[in-house]
From Swiss-Prot:
Keyword tags: Acetylation, Cell projection, Cytoplasm, Endosome, Lipoprotein, Membrane, Methylation, Palmitate, Phosphoprotein, Synapse
Modified residues (N-acetylserine): 2
Source organism of the structure: Rattus norvegicus
Modified residues (Phosphoserine): 2, 448
Tissues expressing the protein: Expressed in brain and in peripheral nervous system (at protein level). Weakly expressed in neurites.
Gene Ontology CC annotation, any one: glutamatergic synapse
S-palmitoyl cysteine-type lipidated residues: 3-4
Superkingdom in the source lineage: Eukaryota
Gene label: Ncdn
Record field: transmembrane: none
Entry-annotated residues carrying Asymmetric dimethylarginine: 75
Protein name: Neurochondrin
Length: 729
């Protein structure tokens, strides 16, 4: 058979075999097409390549285009098998005058025919051809060669068929398909649009695996798409808006793409658009805000105007969607707008290096207030049957972000919604596994198939903690929260989260949000200790909380990098101990002694004597561990000193325990070794408070202080109360 015959067989074979995409016009059954049966028999009995080629040619003549059905296709496969197409794909010895690609084209055409059967598309003999097929996508050749184009089409048909099988995407990614598709798209050769379509499908099916296997190539595609987006002047810019979110990496968007993406979005959103044109742009902007914060927006006038435009559009969309009862809500668009509103909240509350000027902040806060009012209006209408829907979770999230920064406005509406928020948080807390799934659904709904990051925490209560911290300071909201059972829920939540930090858990892999959530819980409890002490005394959940604080602090104060959490736990425990001083658990039990020893360690290690050049006397200075976080720590430290002072007369065993720790002696020694001028008045007052109560509570403490030059030190620092106490017998 000549080269021309081979080519003809390939092309004619394609005409018949590839007709599987069409609906069968006739059902070629055995009894109705004896000619086909005879040719299939010849194909089965062929003894060499030439006979197989000839038989294939006869089969294609017997089966007209559009006549082939799945059964006939399978019988052709049974006659040909995989051995022959395998040889065609890998042979390096073509007949004289016949280009190699003619043989490969026929091999790919046969595979494409077989892959029309889903069972064959997942066959190992097809899967092991993936690397070979990928080479055809990137091979150089004559762009006008019809045979080569046909082979590329068949290659994409094979890969697309494999992608449609249950485990197909995984096999394609492992076989290097993602890189090959990226290179084929970037080369803009024949079929590059098919490469992009298949890439989109693989990213949608297995995004994480795609990025793991081919990150450099995918980033190159992202750069190319971003440049196209920035330059696009026609309708393609709207198509790119829908494509680009899929190509944003799960970690950080490359800075070199920021300018193009922002410029393209600015041009779209700055125009008068219909909703179908605007919504993909809002979703892309939300995806960028989720991944990059405001880093993708340029500094300066243009950037601030663009950010203001984004937030304005988002707020308008939210109000239009949520204020009208009975209106169908486009939840994916509104959730994207929530992400843009959250970006606006962050920028409006940023003191340094904010993109916005003060007048812009004032204007945006007013606009966002109206949108948050619409969110509250929506949540007030949510029935129990909808509480597990992802969109409700997203709505609670944006409300939580607002309440974390602003509780003075919309006070009446917020108070009206508080009972719902407590019930909602309790429902998701009690079904923690489903709540985590809701968080995943929110990420899918809002932005892209990307796995949620820190921006989408897995429980509703954590979203509400900052706002509740502010609200527990106010009488009205606090009474509602107490009435609805929020304190008991918070105690349970704190104990559950604390388990994640206990021995046996790897705290190094804990997200920061867990520790921040624990600290915020402590702040809420501190507010309740001060404003509702009766609640602490009567609610049994606080007894359980106190027990956990006592058993946990000794190990916590020893852990590097967790000083701020230790400060919260120590201060909260000391304040609660004053209210629960009659509890059996605080009567000198091992747990209570361990807790107070750890609290003394926290309070006593805050300051040290530091030598100063050119001076004989040292100065009082912060310890290295405390110095970097003192701005966040100092209020807790002073409150802890005050609380410890209040515990001394209530717990008779505490003063002797403090004496055994040598804290009073070391404190006087520290004060005696530094210049009094280096000790601020508030520090003097805090130290004197502790020393006076210890001296009053225990004779041995007074004697130890006198031996440590306590009276002289008290005189130097004008501690009149301490000086008088030590002068007494």
């Amino acid at each position: 058979m000549s080269c021309c015959d081979l080519a003809a067989a390939g092309q004619l074979g394609k005409a018949g075999i590839m007709a599987s995409d069409c609906e069968p016009a006739l059902n070629q059954a055995e009894s109705r097409n004896p000619t086909l049966e005879r040719y299939l028999g010849a194909l089965r009995e062929a003894k060499n390549d030439s006979e197989q080629f000839a038989a294939l040619l006869l089969v294609t003549k017997a089966v007209k285009a559009g006549d082939i059905d799945a059964k006939t296709r399978r019988r052709i496969f049974d006659a040909v098998g995989f051995t022959f197409p395998n040889r065609l794909l890998t042979t390096k010895e073509a007949p004289d005058g016949c280009p190699d690609h003619v043989l490969r084209a026929l091999g790919v055409a046969l595979l494409a025919c077989f892959c029309s059967d889903p069972e064959l598309a997942s066959h190992p003999q097809v899967l092991n051809k993936i690397p070979i097929l990928c080479t055809f996508l990137t091979a150089r050749g004559d762009p006008d060669d019809a045979a080569r184009r046909s082979m590329i089409d068949d290659t994409y048909q094979c890969l697309t068929a494999v992608a449609g099988t249950p485990r197909g995407p995984r096999h394609l990614i492992a076989g290097g398909t993602v890189s090959a598709l990226c290179q084929a798209y970037l080369g803009h050769g024949y079929g590059f649009d098919q490469a992009l379509a298949l890439l989109v499908g693989l990213l949608a099916a297995a995004e994480t695996q795609c990025w793991k296997e081919a990150e450099p190539d995918l980033l190159a595609v992202l750069r190319g798409l971003s440049e196209d987006f920035q330059r696009a002047e026609d309708a393609s810019k709207f198509e790119l808006c829908q494509l680009l979110p899929l190509f944003l990496p799960p970690t950080t968007v490359p800075p070199e793409c920021h300018r193009d993406l922002q410029a393209g979005l600015a041009r779209i959103l700055g125009s008068k658009l219909s909703s179908w044109q605007r919504n993909p742009a809002l979703k892309l902007a939300a995806r960028l805000a989720h991944a990059c914060g405001s880093d993708w927006i340029p500094v300066g006038s243009s950037g601030s105007k663009f950010l203001a435009l984004l937030v304005n559009l988002a707020c308008v969309e939210v109000r239009l969607a949520l204020e009208e009862t009975g209106t169908e809500v486009k939840e994916d668009v509104v959730t994207a707008c929530y992400a843009l509103m959250e970006l606006g909240i962050q920028e409006c509350t940023r003191c340094e290096q904010s993109l916005l000027k003060e007048p812009q902040k004032v204007q945006l806060v007013s606009i966002m207030k109206e949108a948050i009012g619409a969110v509250i209006h929506y949540l007030l209408r949510v029935g129990p049957e909808k509480q597990k829907e992802p969109f409700v979770f997203a709505s609670v999230r944006i409300l939580g972000a607002w309440l974390a920064e602003e509780t003075s406005s919309l006070r009446k509406e917020v108070c009206q919604l508080l009972p719902f928020l407590v019930r909602y948080a309790k429902t998701l807390y009690e079904e923690a596994e489903e709540a985590s799934d809701i968080s995943q659904q929110v990420a899918n709904l809002a932005i892209s198939p990307t796995t949620p990051g820190p921006a989408w925490p897995g429980d509703a209560l954590r979203l509400l903690l900052p706002g509740w911290c502010h609200l527990t300071v106010e009488d009205g909201p606090r009474e509602i929260l107490i009435k609805e059972g929020a304190p008991s829920l918070l105690c349970k939540y704190f104990l559950q989260q604390w388990e994640l930090t206990s021995p046996g858990h790897d705290t190094s892999v804990l997200p920061d949000s867990v520790e921040i959530g624990l600290q915020t819980c402590c702040h809420i409890f501190l507010n309740l200790v001060v404003t509702a002490p009766g609640l602490i005394k009567r609610d049994a959940c606080f007894t359980s909380l106190m027990n956990t604080l006592m058993t946990s602090l000794p190990s916590l104060v020893q852990q590097q990098g967790r000083l701020l959490l230790a400060a919260n736990v120590a201060t909260l425990g000391l304040l609660m101990a004053r209210l629960l001083s009659t509890s059996p658990a605080l009567q000198g039990t091992p747990a209570s002694r361990g807790f107070f020893a750890a609290a003394i360690l926290f309070l006593s290690q805050s300051h040290v004597a530091r030598a100063t050049p050119g001076s004989d006397q040292a100065v009082l200075a912060l310890s290295p561990d405390y110095e970097g976080i003192w701005a966040d720590l100092q209020e807790l430290w002073f409150l802890g000193m005050q609380a410890f002072t209040g515990c001394v007369p209530l717990l008779p065993w505490l003063a002797p325990a403090a004496l055994r720790s040598r804290w009073p002696q070391e404190l006087l020694q520290l004060l005696g070794s530094v210049s009094p001028n280096s000790v601020k008045p508030e520090m003097v007052a805090a130290y004197q408070g502790v020393l006076v109560e210890l001296a009053r509570a225990n004779r041995l403490c007074r004697e130890a202080m006198r031996l440590q030059a306590g009276e002289e030190t008290a005189s130097h620092y004008r501690m009149a109360a301490l000086e008088q106490c030590l002068s007494e017998p």
